[in-house]
Every structure is written in C-alpha cells, then in structure tokens.
Swiss-Prot record:
Entry superkingdom: Bacteria
Gene designation: yhbP
Family: Belongs to the UPF0306 family.
Name of the protein described by the UniProt record: UPF0306 protein YhbP
Organism, as annotated: Escherichia coli O157:H7
Alphabetized SUPFAM superfamilies for the sequence: FMN-binding split barrel (SSF50475)
Classification via InterPro entries: Split_barrel_FMN-bd, UPF0306
Amino acid sequence: METLTAISRWLAKQHVVTWCVQQEGELWCANAFYLFDVQKVAFYILTEEKTRHAQMSGPQAAVAGTVNGQPKTVALIRGVQFKGEIRRLEGEESDLARKAYNRRFPVARMLSAPVWEIRPDEIKFTDNTLGFGKKMIWLRGSGTEQA
C-alpha cells in the first residue's frame, strides 16, 4: 500500500490533532478537531486568535504535532507524527476550507474562529497492526516515500 494512501485513510478515521509551536524558546501545544485534505496533504483547524498557541504562531510558524488513537494494546497502536508549517488562512482560501470543515463538523457553523492550515513537510506513520514498530515516512516534495 502506498504510504500517503495508508496515512490518509487512517487520518480520515480520526478527528483530533495535537500541534505544538514555539516562540522565543517557549513551547505550547493545543488540540483541535481537524479536516484532512488528501490532495493538499494538510490539516484544517479552527482556533481563536486570542489563544496562546495562535498568538505564538502569528500569521505563520513552524509546527510539529501528532494524531493518535487510544488502543488498549500495544499491537493496535497507530499514530502520526509530523512537522511542517501552520498559517492562518485569509480570503477565498479560508472560505473554501471553512465550507469543507463545516461539512465534516456542522456544529462549527456557529463558530467565527479563523481557519488555520497545518501543512506537514514530513509525516511518520506508526502502524503496529502491520507488525510491531512498523513505520512509514512521507516527505513533501521529495518524490520518494520510505516504508
């Protein structure tokens, strides 16, 4: 199975991302419901600008994060670790992402929080259901995938 396909299928079944940013040596993490865009390989989230993590991100920042399930046994562990960039969307980009986000999470229609894009440059997918410690790595723009 192609690495990005396996990652995308698993991410489509999850809904909470944890992401971390840093500013002047201070780290902060946050959680949010996400929409994953398979074509752009990007997460879309809503978060208020007044939050600590948004303030630390500014309009654009380096980001790292995870998506994981809560399995009861080690043999069922699956999860994603990533690094990349987070940025606040504006204009048409924001409008299109918000429409898609609202389709997945209709309750979000009541929120006015800005839309942010988390664009991973590297994704590591651990899937113990394929064998203990099985890892797949996707790198943006490299033209290669490591399994």
